[in-house]
Amino acid sequence: MKQGIHPDYHLVVFEDSATGYKFISGSTATSKETVEWEDGNEYPLVRVEVTSDSHPFYTGKQKFTQADGAVDKFNKKYGFK
C-alpha cells in the first residue's frame, strides 16, 4: 500500500441525535468533539441524524403509502369502478 495517500482509519463514537444512542465503529470521519467510551478511552464523537436505532425501517415503525397507479387514476377520472 502506498504511504500518505489513504485517509486515517480509526475508532469513532457515533451518536444518534434523535435518540442519544451511541456506538463505536471504525471510520475515517473526524470531529473536534471527543467523548469517553465505556472502555475508558477517549474517541472522536460524530453526531448523526439517523442510525439503525431511529430509522423507521429498523425500528418496525415504517409506514407504507398506497400510490394510485395510472389505471386507478383513469378510472377515477372517468367514473369507472
From Swiss-Prot:
Gene3D superfamilies: Ribosomal protein L31 (4.10.830.30). InterPro entries: Ribosomal_bL28/bL31-like_sf, Ribosomal_bL31, Ribosomal_bL31_B, Ribosomal_bL31_sf. Part of the 50S ribosomal subunit. GO terms for molecular function: structural constituent of ribosome. The gene is rpmE2. This is Large ribosomal subunit protein bL31B. It holds the Pfam family Ribosomal_L31. It comes from Limosilactobacillus fermentum (strain NBRC 3956 / LMG 18251) (Lactobacillus fermentum). Keywords: Ribonucleoprotein, Ribosomal protein. The keyword Ribonucleoprotein applies.
